[in-house]
A protein has these predicted regions:
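A glycine-rich helix N-cap at a beta->alpha junction
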Residues: 1-4, 82-95, 372-380, 399-416
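Thiamine diphosphate
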Residues: 1-52, 63, 295-298, 305-387, ...
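Short, structured coil segments at secondary-structure junctions
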Residues: 27, 168, 192, 217-219, ...
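C-terminal helical cap/extension that packs against the catalytic core
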Residues: 413-433
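Flexible, low-complexity linker and terminal segments
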Residues: 34-288, 293, 310, 429, ...
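Residue-level recognition of beta-strand->loop/alpha-helix junctions
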Residues: 174-176, 379, 418
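Short, charged/polar "capping" segments at the starts of alpha-helices
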Residues: 11-13, 148-151, 205-207, 386-387, ...
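Acidic/polar loop patches that form or flank catalytic/metal-binding clefts of enzymes
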Residues: 58-59, 205, 259, 349-350, ...
Length: 508
């Protein structure tokens, strides 16, 4: 089994930063950390082979720069071929789990057989690599994952070529199996070094493993990374590293001989940029794209309040729309179930995207029905995962299916609001009790729904489904073909925003 873990270490499209390293370690799952698209392919195939050989799950860290990227790759069968290590002990009945397996026997097999086999497999198949070595190395860099490509960029900006680095005694060890660290390989890497700089994104993970592996060496090098030997901050432990941060660390830790003219010039440029960062800037709150249906769908009637959700409609929190609070994706509206008992407010709206509804949000609707909550879910259908690339939502659940499912879950009243109310009218999947409205009636429909106390004895829920694709998706479809444009049914009258920029008169 190869388990892919999607991480967002800089919180670019998530509400919090994330890293899978400690989760995999706590589950005692060996973890691979690819640096680029090519290694995603290599580690993916080798990870599956590793899982078979060691009899354990194998995890792989995935970030946007490795999974949402393109790269020209030479497909070399020899690179993906694997060999089984020789001389590794194996239980007579194999390494895999079996029926009636006592817990302590499983624990012993995992700790004493499977994890050592994972290290041996990685060693035999070149997952950890000495990418640069020197016969008289004194300074070492241990790096893992995407940070390796950023390190290469920083070295290039500093004018440090491989030949120059080798001549000055630099050794670079790229760790592919981030956990468990191969202690024997770590000690071989550290032999003869005076200092090791550990480079990794976000939290320290490789650094402390390296310290553990080298602790009993007679002559062990200094290890710096997130902090230097005096405890001063060196590399950020908060998010992804960029080439500027790594270059500053290299400048601070590398021997004097590495300070090339290019490095000095780049450091001077970085200092100038840092000075510019101190200048005041005018803040600009994010806003919806021109023409986006969320611009109207996220409005609530006067006197009402809404709960934000995960997606583009989250931006409503920054606007004057009485929309606050947010939760995990799929939990939209669920906070109200506990909150409503401690407030004089009788009703609330909750925004939820169609993609979220399809994979997990429907459970919040079910929870609200079971809790007899007084809430209106606004299912915002735009047929795209707009914040992270515009992909089609998994499952591609459409408006008729959403309406039918809401009805089946026990939602008391359902209204569909769109530019073309007749588009879905008469669809056999849509219950006969569902109403159809033009978007001009959005405010009126919301006022009606907030007054609904429950159609049955226990249901107090309503749902609005604005069937309206996002603005840029309209334009994309229109460009692709006239037939697609006809399906969109754009209005004849269009509104274009005019940006007025004040230019002060010249003093000349």
């Amino acid at each position: 089994v190869l388990a892919l873990a999607g991480d967002d270490p800089s919180s670019k499209s998530s509400t919090i930063t994330s890293g899978c390293e400690y989760a995999f370690m706590d589950l005692e799952i060996p973890m691979l950390d690819p640096a680029d698209v090519a290694e995603v392919l290599e580690y993916g195939l080798k990870g599956i082979a590793l899982s078979r050989y060691a009899g354990t799950w194998v995890g792989m860290k995935c970030v946007a720069d490795t999974m949402d990227a393109t790269m020209t790759v030479m497909l070399d069968p020899a690179l993906y071929a694997t060999r089984e290590p020789q001389g590794m002990p194996s239980p007579p009945d194999g390494v895999h789990i079996r029926a009636t397996d006592p817990p302590m026997v499983q624990e012993e097999r995992l700790r004493h057989v499977k994890l050592p086999r994972a290290n041996a497999f990685a060693r035999t198949n070149g997952i950890d690599r000495m990418v640069l070595d020197s016969p008289d190395a004194r300074f070492g860099i241990a790096v893992r994952g995407k940070a390796f490509t950023v390190l290469r960029q920083a070295l290039a900006e500093a004018g440090i070529s491989e030949d120059f680095a080798r001549a000055q005694g630099l050794r670079i060890w790229k760790v592919g199996l981030a956990w468990p660290l191969d202690a024997d390989a770590a000690r071989a890497f550290a032999e003869g070094l005076e200092e090791i700089l550990v480079i990794e994104d976000r939290r320290s993970f490789l650094e402390w493993q390296l310290r553990d592996a080298l602790f009993h060496m007679d002559r062990r090098p200094r290890i710096t990374g997130k902090r230097d030997e005096a405890g001063r901050p060196l590399l950020s432990d908060l998010n992804e590293l960029d080439s500027a941060q790594i270059l500053r660390a290299l400048f601070a830790r590398l021997p004097q001989a590495f300070r090339t003219n290019a490095m000095l010039a780049r450091m001077s440029a970085l200092e100038s940029l840092a000075a510019g960062d101190q200048l005041p800037v005018h803040g600009r709150d994010p806003y919806f794209c021109p023409g986006c249906p969320h611009n109207t769908s996220t409005r609530v009637p006067e006197g009402s309040r809404a709960l934000a959700g995960i997606g583009c409609h989250y931006l409503a929190r920054f606007m004057n729309r009485d929309t606050d609070f947010f939760c995990q994706m799929g939990g939209e509206g669920s906070a109200w179930i506990g909150q409503e008992h401690f407030t004089s407010q009788e009703h609330i709206f909750a925004n939820m995207g169609d993609g979220t509804y399809a994979h997990s949000g429907s459970l919040s609707v079910r929870f609200a029905v079971a809790s007899k909550a007084n809430i209106t879910f606004k299912i915002l259908v735009n047929s795209a995962v707009a914040m992270t690339g515009g992909q089609t939502p998994e499952g591609e659940i459409d408006v008729p299916h959403i309406a039918a499912q809401l009805h089946g879950e026990g939602v008391g009243r359902i209204e569909i609001v769109s530019d073309d109310p007749d588009r879905h009218r008469g669809n056999p999947l849509i219950p006969s009790t569902v109403g159809f409205h033009h978007r001009a009636r959005l405010d009126a429909v919301q006022k009606e729904l907030r007054a609904v106390k429950g159609v049955t004895a226990f249901v107090r829920i309503a749902a609005i489904v604005p069937a309206h694709p996002i603005a840029w998706r309209w334009n994309r479809l229109k460009r692709r073909s006239a037939a697609s444009a006809a399906l969109i049914n754009l209005p004849a009258i269009r509104i274009f925003p005019v940006w007025r920029v004040f230019v002060p008169p010249s003093s000349a």
